[in-house]
């Protein structure tokens, strides 16, 4: 292998003579030995560290070029400028190192070599030596202090391209300086192990090296044989012509001359003979080969064999002073004997450790010096030696033995390197580390670290870097001080350990692993600029740390961007982002990636999406598409970015971009293999978010087939489990979900469910485990609510929320991805909880969670989450009809929407347009967004459903089928109504009283032809406001053509009925149940009134049950949920996902029907009347169960029906009445407030106050009178307790039909009354319950007459009302009614239960004149009533003994002194007279005391503010199973808090849920004086004040006592109407 002529080494000759201008090596010793410390690190070049590298390199090249030019002409002048050159080189090395620009170092090294050659050629040998060391030290981790270190330096990736040349130059300098004797041992070791130190370079300058060997042959006297053999080896090995080196003799002669006796005297250098000879011998095998025995004397050889055969102790073979065996050139056979002796020697436990170590040093030093090739015996002995050391290391207890151990391990490590045994070298490193720990020796630890790094550098395998970092974690942990830890860390954290792998992926992997495992162990609090580390390394290292005041301003822009992106500090000048970057910088090729990573993190730090679309498109188009061109693997920096980008796109619902990015990633699977699972996960979520059904189905099938989670890594398992959650949610298969996530997966991968981190997962993974479990519980809740399992849904959702809230406290410590996932899960859990409680109609819990959500919104920070929360709250406030909050949240939501990217986020855009009622734009936006993909998504259809439209069942997803059915029924209803409106007869149908059942079926054959025809009016040109009413409105005239298609309407109504009956009730919200019950009622009412329904009774049972269900369910769930132990919400085991005994709406519907049946079969002498309001028509709905009569009836009262007959009549709709009532109550509450009463000081002020109160009382009276007259009028008898005499009734009924036959035009022409429609008996009975003595009798009777006429009209019997003689009807009917009442027997219903709906609760129905004298109590529902009755065996009235155990609370707040004075004496007498009674007076009761009073008493009386809710939590009352009958006589104790479509909440219901059979309270605030009078009268009438046991004589039941006591109030309506009773009628007995 010949040297190329243009190489600078050709200019150097080993025979170049020394001149007088040569510089002494001693003159530069300080420079040689301290070059690393004395050379300034600051650059002499213009510009700083962040300057453009091209300019700096250009200036450096100019300096080098100038030096070379000057040196060629005047070396002395050039040498004077060498300092400038060195500083320039130093700056360039620092620049390359700092900027990690190792791709440019080769050219700089070449320049440096050229300078060295110039110096050597010009005999500046001292400077040349210095430059050699300078060059080496600037490009290697382990520093050289002299040429000796250079010669024996190992090859690594950092020097393998120049080290052999540098060694040749060093050897030349040694020759020229005639320093061979000084360096001879190192030179001999160099050539003895030339395979390691020289020949590893494939580009070795063999010619120059061979000439140098020949030169050493020439100048040495005792090593001629050695260098001669080496010369012959290289001639043969490199195929060099012998004549080129020695021309006057042949190679054979040269070989023979080596055996000259003068050459054979090698002295101590003979120890290298075997090594040199073995290298020579491997190449020569002919007859001309020199034999080792020819070199050695015969006597010497036989002496060795004789000594070995004598079987002496192994220690006798050792030359302790020389640290080697007594002989050299040991044969393989002789070595085997020695090794066997050594083995026996080690097994002798009696030897002192120091002696043994000394012998082992001798053995292994000799083996290395001999250059013996490795074999099994040597390696076996090596392992035995290591085992011996490990076994006996603890017995080393002095410094000399420790030093011997260090020496031995040093030799063993060199042998491992010689033999290329990295695993055994690792064992030596482990022994060294153990010794450092045992001896607490930093020097041992430092040797351990350096040896480990040497191993890394020599092996040049970047794949081992992680293993090395893990070792350094242990090294650093064992270091005794902070400074020592830093020193050890510096051994690892430097550019050299990067092995010239300048890909971004390796840089990040190395630095982040170093940070995680090692840097954190340093526990430093200040910035340290670790030597030999690049700014990129520092930016990654400190970017992951929390250390403040990092001087990143000295770094390049790209490094600063990396640092800022990792650290989350975005303080870069925006102008810097647009500057031109250093083109030679390592990071320049990653500029786009780094820039968009920074921009993404910048946006995320500001919680914006301003650049999100741009970033994504840039990444896809400019970077991702070129991934095939990249030879390197993806970096963790990019991986984290892509994961974060996918996460942020998903988080902000940029679903379209998320799909595009995910699909691109999947198309580049080779490069993005580690990202593909993430892409799959987000792709599925995007498809699901956009309702792209077919695509989601394809992804679902793909995900179900991949990955074995039992063998997967934890992070992969977490991701895949998350995807599987989406799959199961899509399938809506609760059972499969529960089995997989409750049993299968926990058994397969328990660490995924380790909430307590018993597996000691790293914090980042542990957080992800918690987030996964939050998602599992959230989605379990969602699946449960889909399946109608409300209880399980609440429990799981509460668990998710508790976990999420616990994490929220530490949100600032979470990664961005975890933080976003947490916010999403937390908001989802709130939404779910509120939705669940909306589902069950629980207003109290909805309000609690909505307020909590409102409270934390500001802490959520992310606009998308804030907007979604505000949007959700806006919809919630619409449901609860909190108009003010609704408007406020809409305004805030619109402001939050301004921060969103509406173009990319179709979900938020459609929400925004929907909330702002821009429905046309909503549909247009969907078309624009999806374009030609519109057919692939269900989203437009979903919004059609939200907009109240119905869609084809074939395209409707199963979970939205109920909504589709409700919309369809509602739309069909609108069409029916439209048809009715077009017809002059039927358009006023809902201005007429309608009843079910209303008529008896008539046999068609007996009816005249005109009866079944659609009725026609004798009028023309009717307007929409016209109505078939009095003569003034129905003139005679020509019949008009009818537009009402009865058959079509009936068909639609029956279809509506079937659709409503097909609904799966479990899937409906409670307010939707109310809506369908209203629709069902309307459908049934119209069908019943325009056709004869043969199964009206069955239909009413169904309708009553459906109406009662939304009243019953909230109370049931309130009780059940309240009794759940809180520990269930903190039990995070997924095995709890499978929860039995869930309450189902379907089963409860059956229960409601059963309760209705039980009530009807009880045969109790009661009426159960339901009062409700229909929001669709504005009608008042009355339903009645009559157990004694086995009859169900239903009335639909139009509240403006009198107005339709008399245009002058005052109109009072239900909303208007409610508004007036609330106004009166609110004004009354204000007048009784402390703020108002405390200001009354003068007589005039008191008079003014009373005037206001009287006026309010009068307004209340007028309102009740209006309600009574305009709403109920003739149908007041519906509430009457009178029982009609059956025999008298039949006579009246015959007369009734006779009167109709005489007066109705439709019947006058026909002789047989049996041919005509007959109305139901209960309708006729209403006439008999009218009292002719009443002033408004005629008005009431007229109301009933129109009721009957409308029944006939809607069933097809046409009568023009202006042709009827109403006066005659009035006279004839009045006569018959008087006859009946004159002969009837008095018989009445014992008690009336009012089932008052939430919308009707506030009205004091009991104070209407036709109800005020009745025994009335309220109940929330049929089920509640039936439960109370069954509990007390259906015995009424309920008799309660009060001869003992009475509990009373009087004036607990201490501010009702007058009330206290009034009742103190009475209560004290009761305490004295009735054993076990208890009184708490003028002090606040403890919760436990109050609960005991409620549970353990026969009667509980509370006289104070409110209902005592301030002293006991409602949930504690609800937990009770039995509560005493209770009198809550404070203000608003029976008031309900209204929340629109949700069921109201109040103290009264709390007591009923706690098992109270009867509770009395006030509907609104009352004045203490009046309510005290009422209470006193009440106590008197029901026998509570009696001092004797005679309670059974004159005492009244509580319900009668209440009705009789109202009149004592000064303000009979404002105060007297407030008390109401809930529960059973009770009578107190002794």
From Swiss-Prot:
Source organism, top-level taxon: Eukaryota
EC code: 3.4.22.49
Molecular-function GO term, any one: cysteine-type endopeptidase activity
Keywords assigned: Calcium, Chromosome partition, Cytoplasm, Cytoskeleton, Hydrolase, Nucleus, Protease, Thiol protease
Active site: 1531
Domain Peptidase C50: from-to ranges: 1443-1542
Keyword rRNA-binding recorded: no
Gene Ontology CC: one annotated term: spindle
Quaternary structure annotation from Swiss-Prot or TrEMBL: May bind calcium. Interacts with PDS1. Interacts with MCD1.
InterPro entries in the cross-refs: Peptidase_C50, SEPARIN_core_dom
UniProt GO BP: apoptotic process; meiosis II; meiotic chromosome separation; mitotic sister chromatid segregation; negative regulation of protein localization to nucleolus; positive regulation of exit from mitosis; positive regulation of metaphase/anaphase transition of meiotic cell cycle; proteolysis
Protein name from the UniProt record: Separin
Function: Caspase-like protease, which plays a central role in the chromosome segregation by cleaving the MCD1/SCC1 subunit of the cohesin complex at the onset of anaphase. During most of the cell cycle, it is inactivated by securin/PDS1 protein. It also promotes anaphase spindle elongation. A component of the FEAR (CDC14 early anaphase release) network which promotes CDC14 release from the nucleolus during early anaphase. Cleaves SLK19.
Subcellular location: Nucleus; Cytoplasm, Cytoskeleton, Microtubule organizing center, Spindle pole body; Cytoplasm
Catalytic activity: All bonds known to be hydrolyzed by this endopeptidase have arginine in P1 and an acidic residue in P4. P6 is often occupied by an acidic residue or by a hydroxy-amino-acid residue, the phosphorylation of which enhances cleavage
Pfam families membership: Peptidase_C50
Species per Swiss-Prot/TrEMBL record: Saccharomyces cerevisiae (strain ATCC 204508 / S288c) (Baker's yeast)
Activity regulation statement: It is inactivated via its interaction with PDS1, which probably covers its active site. PDS1 degradation at anaphase, liberates it and triggers MCD1 cleavage.
Region (Disordered), start-end ranges: 1016-1037
């Amino acid at each position: 292998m010949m040297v190329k002529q243009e190489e600078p080494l050709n200019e150097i000759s080993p025979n170049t003579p020394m001149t007088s201008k040569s510089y002494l090596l001693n003159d530069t010793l300080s420079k040689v030995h301290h070059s690393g410390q004395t050379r300034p690190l600051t650059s002499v070049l213009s510009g700083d560290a962040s300057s453009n590298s091209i300019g700096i390199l250009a200036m450096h090249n100019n300096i080098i070029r100038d030096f070379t030019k000057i040196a060629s002409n005047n070396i002395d002048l050039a040498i004077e400028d060498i300092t400038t050159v060195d500083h320039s080189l130093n700056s360039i090395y620092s620049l390359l190192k700092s900027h990690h620009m190792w791709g440019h170092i080769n050219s700089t090294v070449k320049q440096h070599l050229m300078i060295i050659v110039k110096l050597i050629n010009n005999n500046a040998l001292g400077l040349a030596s210095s430059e050699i060391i300078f060059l080496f030290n600037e490009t290697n981790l382990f520093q050289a202090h002299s040429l000796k270190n250079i010669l024996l330096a190992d090859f690594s990736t950092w020097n393998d391209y120049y080290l052999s040349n540098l060694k040749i130059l060093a050897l030349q300098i040694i020759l020229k300086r005639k320093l061979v004797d000084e360096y001879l041992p190192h030179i001999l070791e160099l050539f003895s192990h030339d395979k390691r130190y020289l020949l590893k370079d494939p580009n070795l300058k063999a010619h120059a090296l061979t000439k140098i060997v020949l030169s050493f042959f020439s100048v040495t006297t005792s090593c001629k044989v050695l260098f001669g053999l080496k010369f012959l080896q290289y001639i043969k090995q490199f195929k060099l012509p012998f004549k080129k080196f020695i021309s006057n003799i042949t190679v054979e002669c040269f070989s023979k001359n080596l055996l000259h006796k003068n050459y054979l005297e090698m002295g101590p250098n003979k120890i290298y003979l075997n090594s040199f000879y073995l290298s020579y011998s491997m190449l020569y095998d002919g007859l001309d080969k020199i034999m080792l025995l020819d070199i050695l004397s015969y006597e010497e050889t036989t002496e060795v064999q004789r000594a070995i055969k004598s079987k002496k102790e192994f220690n006798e073979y050792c030359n302790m002073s020389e640290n080697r065996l007594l002989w050299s050139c040991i044969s393989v056979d002789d070595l085997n004997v020695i090794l066997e002796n050594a083995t026996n020697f080690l097994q002798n436990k009696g030897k002192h450790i120091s002696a043994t170590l000394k012998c082992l040093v001798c053995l292994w030093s000799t083996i290395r010096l001999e250059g013996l090739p490795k074999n099994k015996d040597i390696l076996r002995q090596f392992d035995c030696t290591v085992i011996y050391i490990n076994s006996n290391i603890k017995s080393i207890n002095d410094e000399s033995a420790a030093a011997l151990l260090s020496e031995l391990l040093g030799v063993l490590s060199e042998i491992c390197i010689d033999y290329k045994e990295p695993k055994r070298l690792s064992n030596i490193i482990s022994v060294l580390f153990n010794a450092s720990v045992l001896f607490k020796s930093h020097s041992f630890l430092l040797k351990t670290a350096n040896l480990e790094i040497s191993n890394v550098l020599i092996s040049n395998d970047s794949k081992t870097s992680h293993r090395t970092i893990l070792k350094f974690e242990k090294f650093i942990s064992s270091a005794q001080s902070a400074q020592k830890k830093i020193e050890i860390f510096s051994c690892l954290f430097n550019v050299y350990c990067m092995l010239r792998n300048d890909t971004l992926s390796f840089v990040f992997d190395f630095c982040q692993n170093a940070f995680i495992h090692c840097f954190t162990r340093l526990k430093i609090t200040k910035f340290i600029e670790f030597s030999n580390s690049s700014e990129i390394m520092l930016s990654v290292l400190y970017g992951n740390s929390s250390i403040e005041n990092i001087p990143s301003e000295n770094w390049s822009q790209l490094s600063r961007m990396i640092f800022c992106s990792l650290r989350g500090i975005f303080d870069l000048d925006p102008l810097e982002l647009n500057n031109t970057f250093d083109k030679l910088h390592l990071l320049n090729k990653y500029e786009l990636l780094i820039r968009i990573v920074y921009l993404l993190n910048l946006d995320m730090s500001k919680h914006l999406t301003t650049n999100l679309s741009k970033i994504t498109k840039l990444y896809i188009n400019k970077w991702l598409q070129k991934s095939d061109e990249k030879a390197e693997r993806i970096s963790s920096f990019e991986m984290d970015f892509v994961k974060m980008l996918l996460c942020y796109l998903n988080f902000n619902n940029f679903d379209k971009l998320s799909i595009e990015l995910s699909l691109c990633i999947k198309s580049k699977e080779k490069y993005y293999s580690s990202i593909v699972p993430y892409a799959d996960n987000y792709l599925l979520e995007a498809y699901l978010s956009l309702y792209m059904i077919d695509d989601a189905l394809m992804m679902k099938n793909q995900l179900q087939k991949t990955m074995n989670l039992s063998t997967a890594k934890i992070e992969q398992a977490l991701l895949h489990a998350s995807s599987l959650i989406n799959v199961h949610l899509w399938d809506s298969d609760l059972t499969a979900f529960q089995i997989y996530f409750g049993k299968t997966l926990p058994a397969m991968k328990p660490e995924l469910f380790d909430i307590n981190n018993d597996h000691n997962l790293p914090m980042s993974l542990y957080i992800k485990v918690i987030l996964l479990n939050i998602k599992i519980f959230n989605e379990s809740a969602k699946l449960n609510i889909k399946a109608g399992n409300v209880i399980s849904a609440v429990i799981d959702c509460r668990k998710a929320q508790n976990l999420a809230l616990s994490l929220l406290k530490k949100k600032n410590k979470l990664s961005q991805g975890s933080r976003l996932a947490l916010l999403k899960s937390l908001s989802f859990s709130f939404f779910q909880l509120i939705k669940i409680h909306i589902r069950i109609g629980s207003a109290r819990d909805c309000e609690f969670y909505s307020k909590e959500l409102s409270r934390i919104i500001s802490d959520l920070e992310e606009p998308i989450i804030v907007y979604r929360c505000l949007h959700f709250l806006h919809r919630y406030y619409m449901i609860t009809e909190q108009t003010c909050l609704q408007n406020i949240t809409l305004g805030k939501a619109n402001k939050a929407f301004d921060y969103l990217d509406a173009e990319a986020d179709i979900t938020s855009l459609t929400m925004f347009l929907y909330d702002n009622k821009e429905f046309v734009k909503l549909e247009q936006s969907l078309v624009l967004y999806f374009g030609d993909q519109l057919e692939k998504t269900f989203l437009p259809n979903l919004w059609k459903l939200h907009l109240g439209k119905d869609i084809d069942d074939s395209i409707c997803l199963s979970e939205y089928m109920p909504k589709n059915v409700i919309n369809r029924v509602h739309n069909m209803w609108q069409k029916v109504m439209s048809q009715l409106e077009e017809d002059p007869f039927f358009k006023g149908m809902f201005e007429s009283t309608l009843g079910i059942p209303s008529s008896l079926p008539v046999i068609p054959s007996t009816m005249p032809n005109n009866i079944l025809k659609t009725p026609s009016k004798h009028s023309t040109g009717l307007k929409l406001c016209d109505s078939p009413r009095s003569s003034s409105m129905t003139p005679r005239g020509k019949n008009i053509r009818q537009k009402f298609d009865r058959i079509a309407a009936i068909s639609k109504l029956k279809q509506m009925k079937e659709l409503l009956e097909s609904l799966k009730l479990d899937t409906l919200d409670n307010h939707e149940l109310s809506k369908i019950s209203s629709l069902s009622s309307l459908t049934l009412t119209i069908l019943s009134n325009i056709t004869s329904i043969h199964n009206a009774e069955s239909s009413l049972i169904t309708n009553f049950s459906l109406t009662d269900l939304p009243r019953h369910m909230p109370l049931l769930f309130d009780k059940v949920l309240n009794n759940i132990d809180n520990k269930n919400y903190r039990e995070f085991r997924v095995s709890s996902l499978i929860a039995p005994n869930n309450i189902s709406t379907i089963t409860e519907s059956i229960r409601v029907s059963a309760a209705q049946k039980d009530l009807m079969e009880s045969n109790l002498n009661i009426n159960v009347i339901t009062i409700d309001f229909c929001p669709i028509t504005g009608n008042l709905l009355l339903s009645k169960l009559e157990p004694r009569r086995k009859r169900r009836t239903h009335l639909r009262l139009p509240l403006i029906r009198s107005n339709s007959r008399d245009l002058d009549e005052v109109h009072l709709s239900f909303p208007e009445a409610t508004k007036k009532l609330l106004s009166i109550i609110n004004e009354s509450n204000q007048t009784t407030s402390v703020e108002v009463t405390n200001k009354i000081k003068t007589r005039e002020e008191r008079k003014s106050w009373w005037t206001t109160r009287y006026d309010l009382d009068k307004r209340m009276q007028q309102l009740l009178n209006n309600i009574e007259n305009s709403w109920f009028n003739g149908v007041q008898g519906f509430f009457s307790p009178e029982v009609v005499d059956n025999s008298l009734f039949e006579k009246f009924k015959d007369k009734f039909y006779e009167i109709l036959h005489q007066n109705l035009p439709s019947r006058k022409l026909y002789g047989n009354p049996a041919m005509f429609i007959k109305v139901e008996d209960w309708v006729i009975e209403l006439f008999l319950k009218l009292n002719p003595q009443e002033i408004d009798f005629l008005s009431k009777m007229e109301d009933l007459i129109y009721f009957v006429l409308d029944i006939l009209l809607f069933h097809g019997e046409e009568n023009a009302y202006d042709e009827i003689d109403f006066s005659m009807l009035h006279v004839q009917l009045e006569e018959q009614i008087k006859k009946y009442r004159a002969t009837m027997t008095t018989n009445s219903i014992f008690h009336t239960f009012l089932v008052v709906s939430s919308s009707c609760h506030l009205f004091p129905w009991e104070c209407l004149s036709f109800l005020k004298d009745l025994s009335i109590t309220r109940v929330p529902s049929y089920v509640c009533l039936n439960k109370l009755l069954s509990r007390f065996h259906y015995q009424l009235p309920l008799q309660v003994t009060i001869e003992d155990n009475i509990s009373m609370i009087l004036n607990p707040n201490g501010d009702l002194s007058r009330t206290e004075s009034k009742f103190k004496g009475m209560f004290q007498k009761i305490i004295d007279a009735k054993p076990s009674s208890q009184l708490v007076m003028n002090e606040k009761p403890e919760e436990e005391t109050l609960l005991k009073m409620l549970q353990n008493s026969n009667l509980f009386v509370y006289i104070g503010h409110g209902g005592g809710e301030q002293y006991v939590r409602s949930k504690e009352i609800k937990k009770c199973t039995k509560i005493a009958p209770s009198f809550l006589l404070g203000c608003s104790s029976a008031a309900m808090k209204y929340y629109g479509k949700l069921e109201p909440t109040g103290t009264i219901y709390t007591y009923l849920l706690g098992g109270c059979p009867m509770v009395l309270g006030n509907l609104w605030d009352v004045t203490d004086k009046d309510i005290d009078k009422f209470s006193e009268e009440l106590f008197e009438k029901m026998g509570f004040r009696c001092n004797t046991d005679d309670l059974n004589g004159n005492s009244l039941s509580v319900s009668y006592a209440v009705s009789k006591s109202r009149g004592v109030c000064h303000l009979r309506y404002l105060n007297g109407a407030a008390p109401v009773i809930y529960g059973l009628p009770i009578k107190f007995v002794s």
